[in-house]
C-alpha cells in the first residue's frame, strides 16, 4: 500500500490508487489461466458467477477463495428477460440457487451480486439482500473479441482511483487481454487491484442492499453513496450488447430517492 512519488521518494500522506477488476459469467475454461496471473501478481479480483457454471468447476471456485478473490453471484442461468420483468420469487430463486451451489463448491455463499444486463429494481435488491455492483468501465470484450482491442477500450476510458472494470472470463481474448496486457500495465502504473468490497472498505463505504458502480472521489464527495448506480449517458458506456441493450432504472439509494439508468450487462 506504499505510495512513491515520480522521483522514487516515499510519500506517507498518499495511498495507492485502487481499481476493481470484475469478471462475469464464469467460471469457464479460461478462468484458471486468469487465476494464474492473479496469483503471480498477488492481486484480488471479483468473479460474478453463474450458478449453472459452478458445477464441475468446484476446484476453480475454491482456488478463487484461496487467492483472496471475491465470490459474486450473477444469477443461476442469466435469464434472457431482464429481472424487472420477472416476478419477485423467481428473481430471489435465481440468486438463491447460485448461492446454494457456491456453498457446495467452496463453503461460502456470494458476498456481492450483479444483475444480468445490470437491470434490477429496488424491491428485488432488497429481497435478495446483498449489495449489487454495476461498473464504471465496460471493456466491451463481448463485442470486440480481440485482446488488443479490449485493452485499448479499457485504457482509453476514464480509469482512475475507484473505478470498477467489467470483463468476462468466458472469452479467451478477454482473459488474454487481462493476463498479458491489462493486469501487468495497471500494476506497473501503480494501481492496487482489489475486490469490490475491498474497494468500498478503502473508501469507508458501508455496503447496503443497493447498486454501486464506482467509488470515485467525485462520487463520494457528491454524496452519491450508498447505492449510487452511476452509469448514465455522461459517465461510462455500460452497454453489453452480447446480452441486451435494454436498460431499467434502479433506485440509487440516496436520500433523494432519484433513479438513474442502470445500463446493461
Predicted ranges, named:
Residues 1-97, 101-104, 109, 183-185, ...:
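Active-site beta->alpha N-cap acidic-glycine motif
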Residues 217-265:
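Ser/Thr/Gly/Pro-rich low-complexity, disordered linker/stalk segments of secreted
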Residues 19, 161-164:
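Residue-level preference for the first positions of well-ordered beta-strands
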Residues 61-63, 87-89, 148-150, 207-213:
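Short low-complexity, flexible loop/linker segments enriched in glycine and/or proline
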Residues 114-115, 130, 183:
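Hydrophobic alpha-helix-in-membranes signature
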Residues 79-108, 119-161, 174-178:
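Alpha-helical scaffold elements lining the catalytic groove of polysaccharide deacetylases
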Residues 2-6, 10-11, 41, 54-55, ...:
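C-terminal domain-boundary segment and adjacent tail
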Residues 23, 49-52, 73-75, 114-117, ...:
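A cross-domain feature marking catalytic cores of carbohydrate-active enzymes
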Amino acid at each position: 500500500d506504499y505510495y512513491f512519488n515520480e522521483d522514487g521518494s516515499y510519500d506517507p500522506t498518499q495511498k495507492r490508487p485502487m481499481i476493481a477488476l470484475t469478471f462475469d459469467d464464469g467460471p469457464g475454461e479460461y478462468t484458471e489461466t486468469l487465476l494464474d496471473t492473479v496469483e503471480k501478481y498477488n492481486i484480488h479480483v471479483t468473479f460474478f458467477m453463474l450458478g449453472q457454471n459452478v458445477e464441475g468447476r468446484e476446484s476453480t471456485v475454491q482456488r478463487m477463495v484461496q487467492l483472496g478473490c471475491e465470490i459474486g453471484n450473477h444469477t443461476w442461468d442469466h435469464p434472457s428477460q431482464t429481472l424487472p420483468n420477472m416476478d419477485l420469487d423467481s428473481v430471489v430463486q435465481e440468486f438463491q440457487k447460485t448461492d446454494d451451489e457456491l456453498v457446495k463448491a467452496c463453503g461460502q455463499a456470494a458476498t456481492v451480486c450483479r444483475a444480468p444486463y445490470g437491470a434490477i429494481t429496488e424491491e428485488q435488491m432488497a429481497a435478495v439482500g446483498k449489495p449489487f455492483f454495476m461498473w464504471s468501465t465496460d471493456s466491451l470484450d463481448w463485442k470486440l473479441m480481440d485482446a488488443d482491442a479490449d485493452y485499448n477500450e479499457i485504457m482509453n476510458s476514464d480509469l482512475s482511483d475507484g473505478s470498477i472494470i467489467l470483463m468476462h472470463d468466458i472469452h479467451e481474448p478477454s482473459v488474454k487481454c487481462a493476463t498479458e496486457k491489462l493486469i501487468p500495465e495497471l500494476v506497473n502504473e501503480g494501481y492496487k487491484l482489489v475486490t469490490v468490497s475491498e474497494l468500498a472498505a478503502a473508501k469507508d463505504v458501508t455496503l447496503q442492499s443497493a447498486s454501486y458502480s464506482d467509488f470515485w472521489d467525485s462520487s463520494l464527495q457528491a454524496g452519491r453513496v450508498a447505492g449510487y448506480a452511476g452509469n448514465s449517458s455522461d459517465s461510462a458506456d455500460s452497454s453489453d450488447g452480447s446480452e441486451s441493450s435494454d436498460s431499467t432504472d434502479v433506485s440509487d439509494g440516496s436520500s433523494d430517492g432519484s433513479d438513474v439508468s442502470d445500463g446493461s450487462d
